[in-house]
């Protein structure tokens, strides 16, 4: 079920249907009508649900795009299109998640669904997928693992999106992934998995006590990182969590995470990191952070580092070919 509505015809973007880096998207612009060539979803669109639009793409391998008009879409989606696909949400400001008016929501726990992947509101298994200005939530809440989005593909890009849940919100399962100007909210292990991921200029928001990250890197040959760069780490509005949140814990034995150039609020426990997998020797780093939670003098399980890591280290030599640099 959904309740879409259009805000009105304002200045629109003229764009081609591409799933590769969307260089035409500029900060502080609106997107209130469909880019050229996109399938349309909403009360005035060709399709009433996002799932119907995905089905309409069929078995084509051409680049494609879908524009979703304002509304709440109660759907559970699998993104398995064979070509590059971009999903655009309506917004008055493409540079931020804060003005998003499109939400995809579903409520189920992993125990009820049968697996983490099956609990996901959106399950991405298509390489080269990009999403702009869409909120994704799993409304299950406390008591069980319940995924909002699982990224299980390579070269995934999320721009101005919001991911909300409680435990296991964002399952970065595999591949390389890029999150820019997004918000990720949860309480327990709400960024987890084995992907190599860059989070840039994001708000990472705890709505309960627990650990933020749970990397499942487990071999020294695994090149994966979680790089949290120029982000704000804070409590959800109205929630008091002073020293109740850890930067991470190792889901697998060689977890590797860095927080760099970020603002760590007073929610961060002075120990910084905590335990999970038996026998773990994680690689946990902090570099050039600020804020009440950035004092590292009492940190545990942490390794020193002399410089920030870069996108090439995290995403590989070709990162500039597939991320949207305008973000």
From Swiss-Prot:
Family annotation (InterPro entries): Pectin_lyas_fold, Pectin_lyase_fold/virulence, Pectinesterase_Asp_AS, Pectinesterase_cat
Keyword Hydrolase: yes
Record carries keyword Cytoplasm: no
A GO CC term attached to the entry: extracellular region
Site (Transition state stabilizer): 167
Subcellular location, record wording: Secreted
Catalyzed reactions per annotation: [(1->4)-alpha-D-galacturonosyl methyl ester](n) + n H2O = [(1->4)-alpha-D-galacturonosyl](n) + n methanol + n H(+)
Binding site for substrate: 145, 249, 251
Signal peptide: 1-19
GO molecular function, one term: pectinesterase activity
Highest taxon of source: Eukaryota
Enzyme Commission designation: 3.1.1.11
Active site as annotated: 168 (proton donor), 189 (nucleophile)
Family stated for the protein in its record: Belongs to the pectinesterase family.
Function: Involved in maceration and soft-rotting of plant tissue.
Protein name (record): Probable pectinesterase A
Origin organism lineage: Eukaryota, Fungi, Dikarya, Ascomycota, Pezizomycotina
Gene field: pmeA
């Amino acid at each position: 079920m959904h309740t879409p509505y259009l805000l009105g015809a304002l200045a629109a973007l003229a764009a081609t249907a591409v799933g590769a880096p969307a260089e035409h998207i500029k900060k502080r612009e609106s997107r209130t009508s469909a880019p050229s060539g996109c399938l349309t979803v909403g009360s005035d669109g060709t399709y009433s649900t996002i799932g119907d639009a995905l089905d309409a793409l069929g078995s084509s391998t051409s680049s494609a795009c879908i524009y979703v008009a304002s509304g709440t879409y109660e759907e559970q989606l699998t993104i398995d299109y064979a070509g590059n696909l971009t999903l655009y949400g309506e917004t008055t400001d493409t540079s931020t998640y804060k003005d998003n008016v499109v939400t995809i929501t579903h409520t189920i726990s992993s125990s009820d669904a049968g697996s983490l992947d099956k609990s996901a509101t959106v399950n991405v298994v298509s390489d080269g997928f990009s999403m702009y200005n869409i909120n994704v939530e799993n409304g299950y809440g406390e008591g069980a693992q319940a995924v909002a989005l699982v990224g299980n593909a390579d070269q995934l890009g999320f721009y101005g999106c919001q991911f909300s849940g409680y435990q296991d919100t964002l399952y970065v399962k595999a591949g390389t992934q890029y999150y820019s100007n997004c918000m990720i909210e949860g309480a327990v292990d709400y960024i987890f998995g084995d992907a190599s991921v860059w989070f840039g200029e994001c708000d990472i928001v705890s709505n309960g006590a627990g650990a933020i990250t749970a990397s499942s890197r487990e071999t020294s040959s695994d090149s994966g990182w979680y790089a949290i760069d120029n982000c704000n780490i804070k409590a959800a509005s109205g929630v008091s969590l002073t020293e109740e949140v850890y930067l991470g814990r190792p889901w697998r034995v060689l977890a590797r995470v860095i927080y760099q150039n970020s603002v760590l609020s007073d929610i961060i426990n002075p120990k910084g990191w905590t335990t999970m997998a038996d026998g773990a020797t994680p690689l946990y780093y902090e570099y050039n952070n600020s804020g009440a939670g950035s004092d590292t003098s009492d940190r545990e399980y942490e390794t020193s580092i002399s410089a920030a890591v870069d996108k090439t280290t995290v995403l590989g030599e070709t990162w500039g070919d597939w991320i949207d640099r305008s973000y």
